[in-house]
Amino acid sequence: MNNELIEYNLHFSKTIKLTFLKDWSFITVTGKDCFNYLQGQITYNLKLLKSNKHIICSHCTIDGKVLSILRLFMHNDGYAYILRKSTSKFQINELKKYSIFSHVNICQKKDIILLGIMGREARTKLLQIFKNIPHERDSVYQENDVIILKYDQPHERYLIIIKKHNLILNKILSLVDKIYHHKIWLALEIASNFPIIDYNINKKFFPQSLNLEKLNGLDLKKGCYYGQEMIAKIHFKKLNKHYLHWLSGYSYPIPKIGDNIEQKKNKNFSSCGWILSVVKLSTTKIWIQAVLKHYNHYKTNVFRIKNKINSFFYITDE
């Protein structure tokens, strides 16, 4: 991996940068029953969704455990969402389980490309190609079969969904001199506290443990949906004891998704959480996203990967 790729994330560079989002998928949900069907499956209340906005929500098991995290928005006469590619096939199969009696079509689009664009020049450069792009009031813009999503965290950036053979693609690619590694986007997602749920870590956490309430992706009043009973119980009885965190540090070897994290207490280490995502920033720095047990003194605490003496991490997101 090119080290300059990730170091960029520490500063909002002026220069426009572009990456292919190879580890994300684009799914559409259409049909006359798509609203009611999705409403009974996801944690967000679709009645509140506006056509010019994208939102974050989760799709859960009947027991309330998160199968995947979705970035969802209205698209044509239905809905569309972005999720991690490693979970897409499994998530679609789960979503389709009860669709036999509904007029709904759930499809992973394979004829499209997802691009991530960032940098202070990004808006100006994109306006050379498009009539408009998302702004302060809008986070979704669609033009000529191209969808542009605006992200505000950790700073302004854009996700573009475009068909592989769309002539506009070449115009977009001509804006940059080189293509950056796709993990630059993953690092930005970690820095923005977007929960990264890949296949090998799904069905493990409740939405509250992934900060879905803070992200306005969890509705407890909309009525029945998959996992709602257990999710509501956790909320009203205050049973959640885990929270999402962004940690920075060093480890050799590089940690893996699902690895256990330990916190230092006096002279000993005890287990306190799990890794959701890992990005190597440079030879001396690694970012990880993790779910940790609630503990009042985390700000000054030292963490490590379980039984790895050559690892050292601290919380960055507070």
Swiss-Prot record:
Protein name: tRNA-modifying protein YgfZ
Domain of life: Bacteria
GO process terms (BP): iron-sulfur cluster assembly; RNA modification; tRNA processing
Coiled coil: none
CC terms in the record's Gene Ontology section: cytoplasm
PANTHER family: TRANSFERASE CAF17, MITOCHONDRIAL-RELATED
Keyword Amino-acid biosynthesis: no
Binding site for folate: 24, 185
Cell compartment(s), UniProt: Cytoplasm
Pfam families, alphabetized: YgfZ_barrel
Matches recorded under Gene3D superfamilies: 2.40.30.160, 3.30.70.1630, Aminomethyltransferase beta-barrel domains
Role noted for this protein: Folate-binding protein involved in regulating the level of ATP-DnaA and in the modification of some tRNAs. It is probably a key factor in regulatory networks that act via tRNA modification, such as initiation of chromosomal replication.
Keywords: Cytoplasm, Folate-binding, tRNA processing
Broad class of the protein's primary localization: cytoplasm
Protein family per UniProt: Belongs to the tRNA-modifying YgfZ family.
Gene Ontology molecular-function annotations: folic acid binding
Taxonomic lineage: Bacteria, Pseudomonadati, Pseudomonadota, Gammaproteobacteria, Enterobacterales
